[in-house]
Amino acid sequence: MKLFDVYPLYDINIVKGQGCKVWDENGTEYLDLYGGHAVISIGHAHPHYVEMISNQVATLGFYSNSVINKLQQQVAERLGKISGYEDYSLFLINSGAEANENALKLASFYNGRTKVISFSKAFHGRTSLAVEATNNPTIIAPINNNGHVTYLPLNDIEAMKQELAKGDVCAVIIEGIQGVGGIKIPTTEFMQELRKVCTETGTILILDEIQSGYGRSGKFFAHQYNHIKPDIITVAKGIGNGFPMAGVLISPMFKPVYGQLGTTFGGNHLACSAALAVMDVIEQDNLVENAKAVGDYLLEELKKFPQIKEVRGRGLMIGLEFEEPIKELRSRLIYDEHVFTGASGTNVLRLLPPLCLSMEEADEFLARFKRVL
């Protein structure tokens, strides 16, 4: 059997990681400014993370959600405190797409509606309704194209008001900062108006913080810059630092019903140990504050490069838009300067490093970046 060939791959085999660096099988060191799609939050192979997962797998890796798992309760309590959402409830699953599927399902159970509002260039996952809410027709199969979703321009207040005024929208789902869409930031005016109109029309507001959350923006959640509280928040990626895990943070307005939501692997003992280790390190090493400080520095320095059309972002979630396609630039960064970066579309270079990126590593990236321009 061979692998189903759906990933365009760089010819590099990464075998080791430490902090913000990774090494290939030949021993070549790379600076990781991408964190595997924003997944690596506290750094590769953090000693505390390794210790907690190792101890847990030696004791109990998994048992089902038919018995008490006190680690889940610890994750919920800690996440409530660290995020400022102590009065919300937590449902644990394995991936971002699952988080958004369950969020949308919960919203529809709540108000009985079936219509969803998403936004231009949004990305919410690759399954069922999550992919239908993703504004990319090339990955929406006919079986997923069921007419539930209307896409609106981001930050267009009037278009949003007109659509919600119809009174038939189940949920609005929006990213705290658009990631795949090119590091596009919703304005505070738009987000506050969206919160107001959702409340007035009985529409559930879902904040997809899968890429922009967990401290990446310089606040725990990117929407906290906008001073709003959504009804549901979805998290994944950074929650487990590479261990598959995700969560749905649910407002007290929703009442749980036995059997309404469910999962086999979600919230397993290993995943919870990973999540607890991540929160330990985020707090002990002040990684949210570090993301803001180092991110602000990078944003300021990158704006000095005349070759870049526009620099966007918050914290360590940064997009560099160029006039021309960035494919060759990205290749030179990887093969010549040994720096991993990401892309959004054809013209935006995406930076999503671990939140422990130091000022010295930021300077090293800037020096290498300058050499390839």
Describe the role of every protein-language-model region.
Residues 1-373:
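Conserved N-terminal phosphate-binding loop of PLP-dependent enzymes in the Aspartate aminotransferase
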